[in-house]
Amino acid sequence: ISKMIANRIFRFLKYIWQVMIIFVPIDFILGVTKVNLTSSWTIQYDFESIILSMLGFEKYNGEWWFVMPYIFLLIMTPLMFRFLQRKKADFFTDFLVVLGIALFSLYGIPKLMSYDMLIDFKGTVWGILLCNVVYLLPIYLFGMIFAKYQVFSYYHQILPKGILSYPVLLFVAAAGFYMRYKLGSSYDFFLVGPMIYACVMLIKKIPGVIWVSKKAGRYITFVWLIHSFYVFQFGQKFIYSFGNPILIFIVLAVVSFASAAAVYWLFTGLSKGVKKIRCFHNRTV
């Protein structure tokens, strides 16, 4: 593992540690034992489970299923770079490779796991991890392909100029969301890129959006990790009491961002305090 990849993994795990330091005691004090009322999976407060969750081997929060698959994808990133940087690489071939992996995830893995010799493996941590990594791999790899071949720049070149671009972008975004609704997550690798491009191009001209995005960006990973505590572990009555789905989303976003900002600045302040103590100690030694 390169130093850069190791640092990214450490930074990602540090987010998880900081959230767990705050929210595990809250869960424990409130007596939370299940992710939700219908779940058979229970939270384990023993030392081993907490440590394994902090390292990504177990999911303390059920919505954190992506932690270990993402770490594996980071570890695999140098291999993906080598594949994309091979001689005579081209977009069409790379796209076919991603499509093949996606089809294998959609049809091959379920068929493979149905064989008697793999039935027991399917439900294990490693079996679930394998399925999740293969599912996420096309999306992750296609993002790298988009970057290598500057696909967004190509979109920009073929997009109508001026005010005519907005109906096209709106159609692409709406079509993407509709296809996602109809097809589910199986073809995310193909849909996400155009959807992101269309949405970004539609809103980036709105005054203040870029500034807000930059300010909110520092909290977004915390929001990603924290929001499910309010939805699935505690706070459901408050969050869902608003009834209207749009209001529920807005309230959840506000609560999650406020919590994320509090956690961010708490640990930022602690980090600065530790640095000052170290500097003072070094001066006096």
Question: Model-found features: residue ranges?
Answer:
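Interfacial loop-to-helix transition and helix-capping segments at the boundaries
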Residues: 54-69, 109-139, 173-197, 241, ...
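Membrane-interface helix-boundary motifs at transmembrane edges
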Residues: 1-7, 80-92, 148-161, 204-215, ...
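Transmembrane alpha-helical segments and their boundary/interface "anchor" motifs
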Residues: 1-59, 73, 161-168, 215-225, ...
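Alpha-helical transmembrane segments of multipass membrane proteins
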Residues: 19, 23, 27, 77, ...
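Hydrophobic alpha-helical segments with transmembrane-like composition
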Residues: 27-31, 42-112, 127-142
